Design a protein with these regions (language model features):
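N-terminal alpha/beta PP-like core and its mobile active-site loop of ThDP/TPP-dependent enzymes
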Residues: 1-149
């Protein structure tokens, strides 16, 4: 709903690589930023061909990727891979959101980097727990008042 109010079109696709190819096409045809959002782990690995294509075409695509919850990072959780290391060779810049209050700044930086100098794709990682209210996260992990229950 909020995206419609801001004039942002959401287009759902069946495969992550298609999302990035579509974002690249939007950028090339309209000179407006193309943005793709994909799920963590295998969803992100599926984008590599299209990301590399955008890099070689100097296309400023913004790729948003989910990530495992911050509390589970590096512990072998479902879809927990080093996404930043995977994408670094193929994008101009990578960023990760570590706190909700940093979302705006990281997104602003991503758009700046995508267009600065030679244009190219950028990647932002969004851990899943930052996209939900704190109360939901505490319930997921059995936390109350900052202590494990």
């Amino acid at each position: 709903v909020a995206s419609k109010e801001k004039g942002i079109s959401i287009i759902d696709v069946r495969h992550e690589v298609t999302a990035v190819f579509a974002a690249d096409a939007v950028t090339r045809l309209s000179n407006k930023p193309g943005v793709a959002a994909v799920t963590a782990g295998p969803g992100l690995t599926n984008t590599i061909t299209a990301v590399k294509n955008a890099q070689m075409a100097q296309s400023p695509v913004i790729l948003l990727g989910g990530a495992t919850a911050t509390i589970l990072k590096g512990k072998g959780a479902l879809q927990d891979i080093d996404q930043m290391a995977l994408l670094r060779p193929h994008v101009k810049w990578t960023g990760s959101v570590n706190r909700v209050r940093d979302i705006d700044g990281v997104i602003d930086k991503a758009f700046e980097q995508a267009y600065k100098g030679t244009p190219g794709p950028v990647f932002i990682e969004f851990p899943v727990d930052l996209l939900y209210p704190e109360s939901v996260i505490r319930e997921w992990y059995g936390l109350t008042s900052g202590k494990r229950s």
